[in-house]
Amino acid sequence: RVVMAEQKSHVEKGAALAQVQPEGEHHTAERSVNRGRKILVFAHVGRKEARDAARQACAQLYKAGLTPVMTRSDLETLSENWDEPVPVQVVHESVALIDIELGVVLGGDGSILRAAEMVRRTSIPLIGVNLGHVGFLAESEESDLSETVRHIVNSEYTVEERMAIDVEVWNDGKRVHSDWALNEASVEKANRE
């Protein structure tokens, strides 16, 4: 089971996605209400636009009273040249994975799949903000980042399930590989000619 968060589209049963509620169904969370809420910010920190987006998301979350959380490696990369850093907690060190409410993924489909791998045995929903070339799994674009974070701050999302599958490859009666996949898996020839 993989739990993912999403803003707009309908999702198949299996993994959870959060959907932003339509206008008119919002409730406003005050800063004191947000205290204690922990949001995982997962970014493709090898790309400048993802580092900038992560800094922006962390600052916006912190300003609203939420606790931004990142992996140690992402935070170390992000901390370089951060003009106005905000306090960010480290998952598995100062914050347990089970205490995270939601993960926001800043990158393309590859980043979303890596984040899904991290949280797949939990009930943490993920919401993807597309910064990559392929964004089939993301629910919003980089230009919508502030609005997406505002929806997270105000708890303006619902969680839906998405299908995750276990994959096994067998050869001559022996299992040679097993893994999991989100939506689909494919088998290709070893030699592509």
Task: Please state what every model-predicted region is.
Residues 45-46, 109-111, 134:
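Short glycine-rich anion-binding loops that position phosphate/pyrophosphate groups of nucleotides
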Residues 122-140:
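Short, acidic/small-residue loops that bind anionic groups at enzyme active sites
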Residues 66-73:
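Short internal beta-strands
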Residues 17-45:
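Generic N-terminal amphipathic, Lys/Arg-enriched alpha-helix
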Residues 50-51, 110-116:
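Short glycine/serine/threonine-rich phosphate/pyrophosphate-binding segments
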Residues 87-100:
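Short acidic low-complexity segments
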